[in-house]
Amino acid sequence: MAIRYPMAVGLNKGYKVTKNVSKPRHCRRRGRLTKHTKFVRDMIREVCGFAPYERRAMELLKVSKDKRALKFIKKRVGTHIRAKRKREELSNVLAAMRKAAAKKD
């Protein structure tokens, strides 16, 4: 916001005041990942592994069929944004697996 000047007219008329900054509302944190949620999801992923559609999508990503993988995942999860997020997650998993394999050798 513009600096106010003690003027009687114009856009900046009025008394100089400091803006009262309010805390963001609690409802704004919906969907944010907490440490506990991340821990639980990682634990479940470790125990259960990947779903069959995720394994197939990872195979498509391995052979650089990114667009085909996106279309395939979209068909399974329903929306484009969720599909993009899932594809990103699976490609990160593949990258981590490659990194671990390179480190082991």
UniProtKB/Swiss-Prot annotation:
Pfam families named among the record's database cross-references: Ribosomal_L36e
Family to which the UniProt record says this protein belongs: Belongs to the eukaryotic ribosomal protein eL36 family.
Single GO term (MF): structural constituent of ribosome
InterPro entries, A to Z: Ribosomal_eL36, Ribosomal_eL36_sf
Keywords noted in UniProt: Cytoplasm, Ribonucleoprotein, Ribosomal protein
Gene3D superfamilies named in the record: 60S ribosomal protein L36
Function: Component of the large ribosomal subunit. The ribosome is a large ribonucleoprotein complex responsible for the synthesis of proteins in the cell.
Organism this protein belongs to: Gallus gallus (Chicken)
Protein name: Large ribosomal subunit protein eL36
Assembly notes: Component of the large ribosomal subunit.
Gene encoding the protein: RPL36
One term under GO cellular component: cytosolic large ribosomal subunit
PROSITE patterns linked to this entry: RIBOSOMAL_L36E
One Gene Ontology biological process: cytoplasmic translation
Compartments, record wording: Cytoplasm, Cytosol; Cytoplasm
